Amino acid sequence: VRNQDLYIKHIKSGKETRLTDDGKGPIKNAMAEFVAQEEMKRMTGYWWSPDEKHIAFTQIDESPVEQITRSEIYADSIKTINQRYPKAGTNNVLIKLAVMDLASKQKKWIDLGEEQDIYLATVKWMQDSSVVTYQIQNRNQQHLALKAYNLSNKSQTTLLEEKSNTWVNLNKDLHFLDDNKH
């Protein structure tokens, strides 16, 4: 990721390919937003398929998020930084998820549903690279849904939902077996 856009680089040839070209200002491709990093420990916004033929990636729009001014203190200086910071109860980023076929460079935006005030908690591929899964959590963190997007037939299914009157905890325990069913 460079300058808010997604690039790939072929290891043997060194050839670099730019996959997105609309990252600028509040639009960022393949990057984890502040809440994902701080609260969900998700530090990336892109995920290679196991067969390396596709890549899933996020696009975030930070324009709804309030800007704050904060200080960074260094040994020899202090810098003032403007940062978009989603305070409790204020607007979060808008998030989208795409899958790109690396041979054709065609991307498909996955329908994350009508509710836009969501968190994208986790993205994982099934072992055979035919399905990308993702967990969406609502803003009050009382509903977590594990969904699957099938690349070949473009269908989406809900694999599992968890609801609570208080909140649903996130974890890093999501793992799929080689049978691509469990």
Report the location of each language-model feature:
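Beta-strand C-termini and the immediately following turn/loop, strongest in propeller blades
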Residues: V1-D5, H10, T44-W47, A56-E62, ...
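A conserved hydrophobic secondary-structure block that centers on an alpha-helix together
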Residues: V1-P26, I118-T122
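Short loop/turn segments that connect beta-strands within beta-propeller blades
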Residues: I11-G14, D22, D101-K105, N150-K154
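Aromatic (tryptophan-biased) beta-strands that constitute blades/sheets of beta-rich domains
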Residues: K15-T20, K108-D111, S155-L160
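Predominantly five- to eight-bladed beta-propeller fold
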Residues: L19-W47, H54-I110
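Short glycine-/Asp-/Thr-/Trp-enriched loop segments that recur within the blades
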Residues: P26-M43, E115-L120, S164-K172
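Beta-propeller and related beta-repeat scaffolds in trafficking/envelope systems
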Residues: P86-V93, E115-Q116, E161-D178
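Long hydrophobic segments that form regular secondary structure
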Residues: D101-N138
